């Protein structure tokens, strides 16, 4: 398995171009299954999960190619099963189910894999599809969905806020007969992006970005061209990297309006921040950050996908910071690794209390999930000496060309190829 070797300490300074959002590109690629005509999707990041999704769409019979943009023609889809060998590495595969049953009246998806962070049950997806009239069975590790004729619009009140299930229900409802209302819907920018993509193809969706989404079913979706929104988590990760190393950075091709909670906490930490329509600059002027208190919450609250990066910030900050994780259990697996580098922290159930230290020391550490692995790489830039980050396949699932981007900011980082 590949590893990263990181030399520190380094003050990260310069400009970085932000890639398209993985968490919007994935649902959009699956939503393309609903279209009977070709679609062109621009600004799709080059990532392992994206490659897996493109392979999966091809196996279902779609014509998929990448030349700058990703082109998907789901017209010829004639296979309705997403097999285990592709699904096992990626939870997002469950998003194939809604479009398949909505357009073809049948679909089956192997129960998914992905990051090992807590319970992410597919129950909410299944309940939503059942309320739209699908018959669901679980057989031999597969979720199977079928319906006679079209799905029927329904008034669905979600038991808890779920980005994944909101996407599934919204996509399936676009081709249902009649009106669907989703209450307690997730409000993330990536939900809005997926809805905008569907509307480009002829769907009638309103209210995305609020907790109540209304979908007027249509008989078919056509083609279109759509540009995926920038990745707010990648943006936040690079901003934190500059903040913890006392550096100065400009993130370009980004969307400041998707990052209010993160920018507020970086300001609390002592960063000077400026924003334009599609850029954010952060300047620490060589200062150490101040510790901050954070409670993760569904959007527009503080994103759970930025929790690991801010845990690191608190470990090297002045003072003591408390972070409470309310979204996923088991999401502090990076903390013991940071403690091995000299950090001070205590975990009490879903809370981590970090006492800032003046410096970390390079060490061998292991990535456990996507965002945790990014925080370990950044820790390597703060630490004195050499840090080796193992299992970086997690990073490749969610960050495009991360080592090249860090090198352009002055970071010393190399990829060590595994056996």
Curated annotation (Swiss-Prot):
EC nos: 2.5.1.7
Main location: cytoplasm
GO terms under cellular component: cytoplasm
Modification sites for 2-(S-cysteinyl)pyruvic acid O-phosphothioketal: 115
Broad EC category: transferase
Residues reported in the UniProt entry to bind UDP-N-acetyl-alpha-D-glucosamine: 91, 120-124, 160-163, 305, 327
Reactions catalysed according to its record: phosphoenolpyruvate + UDP-N-acetyl-alpha-D-glucosamine = UDP-N-acetyl-3-O-(1-carboxyvinyl)-alpha-D-glucosamine + phosphate
Family statement drawn from the similarity comment of this UniProt entry: Belongs to the EPSP synthase family. MurA subfamily.
Function of the molecule: Cell wall formation. Adds enolpyruvyl to UDP-N-acetylglucosamine.
Matches recorded under HAMAP family: MurA
Protein name: UDP-N-acetylglucosamine 1-carboxyvinyltransferase
């Amino acid at each position: 398995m590949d590893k990263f070797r990181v030399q520190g300490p380094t003050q990260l300074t310069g400009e970085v171009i932000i890639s398209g959002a993985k968490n919007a590109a994935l649902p959009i690629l699956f939503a393309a299954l609903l279209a009977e005509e070709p679609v062109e999707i621009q600004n799709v990041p080059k990532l392992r999960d994206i490659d897996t999704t493109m392979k999966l769409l091809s196996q279902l019979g779609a014509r998929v190619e990448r030349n700058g943009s990703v082109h998907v023609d789901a017209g010829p889809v004639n296979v309705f099963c997403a097999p285990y060998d592709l699904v096992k590495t990626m939870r997002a595969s469950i998003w194939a189910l809604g479009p398949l049953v909505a357009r073809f009246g049948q679909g089956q998806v192997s129960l998914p894999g992905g990051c090992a962070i807590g319970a992410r049950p597919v129950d909410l997806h299944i309940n939503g599809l059942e309320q739209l009239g699908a018959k669901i069975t679980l057989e031999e590790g597969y979720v199977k969905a079928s319906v006679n004729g079209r799905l029927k619009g329904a008034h669905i009140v979600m038991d808890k806020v779920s980005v994944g299930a909101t996407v599934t229900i919204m996509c399936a409802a676009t081709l249902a007969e009649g009106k669907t209302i989703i209450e307690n819907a997730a409000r993330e920018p990536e939900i809005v992006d997926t809805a905008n993509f569907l509307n480009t193809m002829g769907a009638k969706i309103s209210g995305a970005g609020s907790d109540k989404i209304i979908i007027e079913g249509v008989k078919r979706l056509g083609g279109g061209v759509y540009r995926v929104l920038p990745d707010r988590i990648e943006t936040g990760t690079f901003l934190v990297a500059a903040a913890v190393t006392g550096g100065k950075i400009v993130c370009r091709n980004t969307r400041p309006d998707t990052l209010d909670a993160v920018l507020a906490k970086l300001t609390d930490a002592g960063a000077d921040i400026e924003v334009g329509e599609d850029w954010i600059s952060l300047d620490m002027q060589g200062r150490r950050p101040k510790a901050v208190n954070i409670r993760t919450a569904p959007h527009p609250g503080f994103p759970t996908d930025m929790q690991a990066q801010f845990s690191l910030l608190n470990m090297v900050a002045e003072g003591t910071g408390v972070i409470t994780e309310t979204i996923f259990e088991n999401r502090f697996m990076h903390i013991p690794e940071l403690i091995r580098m000299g950090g001070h922290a205590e975990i009490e159930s879903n809370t981590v209390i970090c006492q800032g230290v003046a410096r970390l020391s390079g060490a061998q550490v292991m990535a456990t999930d996507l965002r945790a692995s990014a925080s370990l790489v950044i820790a390597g830039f703060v630490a004195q000496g050499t840090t080796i980050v193992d299992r970086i396949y997690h990073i490749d699932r969610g960050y495009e060309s991360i080592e090249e981007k860090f090198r352009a900011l002055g970071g010393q980082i190399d990829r060590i190829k595994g056996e």
